[in-house]
From Swiss-Prot:
Protein name: T cell receptor beta variable 27
Keyword Signal assigned: yes
Positions in coiled-coil regions: none
Domain (Ig-like) ranges: 22-114
Swiss-Prot/TrEMBL keywords: Adaptive immunity, Cell membrane, Disulfide bond, Glycoprotein, Immunity, Immunoglobulin domain, Membrane, Receptor, Signal, T cell receptor
Signal peptide coordinates: 1-21
Residues annotated as glycosylated: 103
Protein's job: V region of the variable domain of T cell receptor (TR) beta chain that participates in the antigen recognition. Alpha-beta T cell receptors are antigen specific receptors which are essential to the immune response and are present on the cell surface of T lymphocytes. Recognize peptide-major histocompatibility (MH) (pMH) complexes that are displayed by antigen presenting cells (APC), a prerequisite for efficient T cell adaptive immunity against pathogens.
Cited InterPro entries: Ig-like_dom, Ig-like_dom_sf, Ig-like_fold, Ig_V-set, TCR_beta_variable
Source organism of this protein record: Homo sapiens (Human)
UniProt record, GO biological process: adaptive immune response; cell surface receptor signaling pathway
PROSITE patterns linked to this entry: IG_LIKE
Disulfide linkage: 42-110
Compartments, as annotated in UniProt: Cell membrane
Length: 114
């Protein structure tokens, strides 16, 4: 196989797959006051069953807050205290902070999978 053909195969493989597939968090960035309820929405357009919320604090790895295995099916992760979730639609999994506190200052990540 010549270098030109190999380059073509690599480009085809990189371009394969659903390019519109995405997981989004809204809002992307958020600064709030202590005690004011807030909701961060996670949305996915891939019809995935499993969705999860994580937080990452300085010097620590990702820690799971809550996860959902399908609509109306949620369970606690490693650090659920101070958070609530709901899953009324397959594509959305909002994370609710009823009364945010300084110890909840963190990076938050949402994920989905089959």
């Amino acid at each position: 196989m010549g270098p030109q053909l190999l380059g073509y195969v690599v480009l085809c493989l990189l371009g394969a797959g659903p390019l519109e597939a995405q997981v989004t968090q809204n809002p992307r960035y958020l600064i709030t006051v202590t005690g004011k309820k807030l909701t961060v929405t996670c949305s996915q357009n891939m019809n995935h069953e499993y969705m999860s919320w994580y937080r990452q604090d300085p010097g620590l790895g990702l820690r799971q807050i809550y996860y959902s295995m399908n609509v109306e099916v949620t369970d606690k992760g490693d650090v659920p205290e101070g958070y609530k979730v709901s899953r009324k639609e397959k594509r959305n999994f909002p994370l609710i902070l009823e009364s945010p506190s300084p110890n909840q200052t963190s990076l938050y990540f949402c994920a989905s999978s089959l």
